[in-house]
Amino acid sequence: MTRRIFCQKLGKEADALNYSPYPGELGERIYNHISEQAWQAWLSHQTMLINEYRLSLIDPKARQFLEQEMINFLFGTGSEKPAGYTSEKE
C-alpha cells in the first residue's frame, strides 16, 4: 500500500515518496512533507535550471544555488524561471 501524506507543495493529500531523496534534515523534511508528484515537478524544474544557467554540479556554488532553489520551490514562494526562458511546449 502506498504511503499518503499532505503535500505542502500541492496543498493536498497525495502519494508520498518511497525514500528520502536528499541527505540530512532537509531530506527528512522532503520525505515527510513532499509528494512524489511535487518531487517530480522539482526534478523537471531543476533540469531546466541546470541547462539554462549551464550549471556544473561539481561546483559547490552551483549545488548551493540548486539547494536554495529547491527549498524555495518545494516549501517557499516558488523558484523563478531564468529571464527570457520559454518552454518548448510554448
Swiss-Prot record:
Example GO molecular function: iron ion binding
One Gene Ontology CC term in the entry: cytosol
NCBIfam families xref list: PRK05408.1
Keywords: Iron
Pfam families named in the record: Iron_traffic
Protein name per the record: Probable Fe(2+)-trafficking protein
InterPro entries reported in the protein's UniProt record: Fe_traffick_prot_YggX, Fe_traffick_prot_YggX_sf
Organism: Coxiella burnetii (strain CbuG_Q212)
Superkingdom of the organism of origin: Bacteria
Function: Could be a mediator in iron transactions between iron acquisition and iron-requiring processes, such as synthesis and/or repair of Fe-S clusters in biosynthetic enzymes.
BP-aspect Gene Ontology terms: cellular response to oxidative stress
Similarity field: Belongs to the Fe(2+)-trafficking protein family.
SUPFAM superfamilies tied to this protein: YggX-like
